[in-house]
Structures are given as C-alpha cells and as structure tokens.
Amino acid sequence: MKSGDHAAIDVPESSAVAKGKAPLIATPREQKSGFKKGLGIFDFLLRLGAIIAALAAAATMGTSDETLPFFTQFFQFEASYDDLPTFMFFVIAMALIGGYLVLSLPFSIVTIVRPHAVAPRLLLFILDIVALTLTTAAGAAAAAIVYLAHNGNPNTNWLAICQQFGDFCQEVSGAVVASFVTVVVLMSLVLLSGVALKKH
C-alpha cells in the first residue's frame, strides 16, 4: 500500500443506533388502529347522549300528570300517563333502553382500549339493533296517541284533549321527541359499529 492511498473501513451500525431510529411514516396497521380508536371514542360519546335522551324521555313521560282545577261531585278531571297502556309501555321501554346503554359503556371503553377486538363490537352491534327496534316501537306507539290527543278523530268520536290538558300534552310530546332523538343516536351507533366491523 502506498503512503498516499487511504483505506476505507466500513463500520457496522451499532444496534443501539439502529433502535434509536423511528420510521417517519406510520404503518397501515397503526393508521387503522388510530381510526378505530377514534370510532370507539365517538361511539362512547354517542352512548352518553343516548343515555341522556332515553332517561329524559322515560322521566318526562313517567311524571306527566295534570288535574283540572274544577270537578263535580262525582268526577275529578285528571290526565296521567298510567291511564293509557301505551304510555306505560313507553316508560318501561325507555327505562330499559337507558339501563342497557349504561351497561354498554364498559364494552364501548374496551373498543377504545383494544381497537382491533371484534367480539365487543359485534356484541354491541347486535344489542344496539335490538335496542333500536324497541325504541322505535315505543316512540311510534306513543306518537300515535299524542297525535290523537292533539287532533282527535271525528270518525270514531275521539275528542282532542290538549285544549283542556295543555301541560300534560306538552310533557308527553316532549317525551316522544326525546325518544326519537334516542332512535337517531342508536341508528348512528349501528352504522358506526358496521363501519368498524367492515374495517376488520
């Protein structure tokens, strides 16, 4: 070797240096995990909103009661939710839905902590469909009675009572609106679970 020549020596990169390097671009799996975690957080927030709407509907209907300030010797004019089986069914159904949604919160948290877990999402998907069906049935049945209370039905001689029982009708109408808010949120939850399961 001549004195003017320089020898190049390749030094292998140490494992410590190699471990210190992090990829600048996230892998597809990491991106999918972040997307599913975002869906899980949105699912949890929607459930909180549905709980508020369902319990508000049950409480409003369950406390709806109005007594007119005048009465006769034999009659006292009163309107209450328990006078109608449809409204009683509504209160029971919405209370059950509210209870289910509260119990579903831990499973929703699992989907946030473990975004790739299929079993909790599938369970919530099935139970949300059942809850959606029950809520829709209760809300639709109560809405029919509220419509008759506001407008009556001349063909069957059913008289409108909301001119006399204004506060009662306002409360039951608000309860029905809250139930349909719950329906919309449950529909969103079902669609959300479907998207999350499709991404698997």
Curated annotation (Swiss-Prot):
Instruction: Report the principal subcellular site.
Output: membrane
Q: Which UniProt keywords apply?
A: Cell membrane, Cell wall biogenesis/degradation, Membrane, Transmembrane, Transmembrane helix
Query: Where along the sequence do coiled-coil regions lie?
Result: none
Cysteine pairings via disulfide bonds: none
Topology in the membrane? Multi-pass membrane protein
Extract one GO cellular component term from the record: plasma membrane
Parts of the chain on the Cytoplasmic side:
1-38, 108-121, 193-200
Q: Which InterPro entries match?
A: CASP/CASPL, CASP_dom, CASPL
Any one biological process term the GO annotation gives: cell wall organization
Could you name the domain of life of the organism this protein comes from? Eukaryota
Residue spans crossing the bilayer = 39-59, 87-107, 122-142, 172-192
Extracellular side stretches? 60-86, 143-171
Location within or outside the cell: Cell membrane
Subunit and interaction comment: Homodimer and heterodimers.
- Give a short account of what the protein does: Regulates membrane-cell wall junctions and localized cell wall deposition. Required for establishment of the Casparian strip membrane domain (CSD) and the subsequent formation of Casparian strips, a cell wall modification of the root endodermis that determines an apoplastic barrier between the intraorganismal apoplasm and the extraorganismal apoplasm and prevents lateral diffusion.
Q: What family does the database annotate? A: Belongs to the Casparian strip membrane proteins (CASP) family.
Report what the protein is called. Answer: Casparian strip membrane protein 1
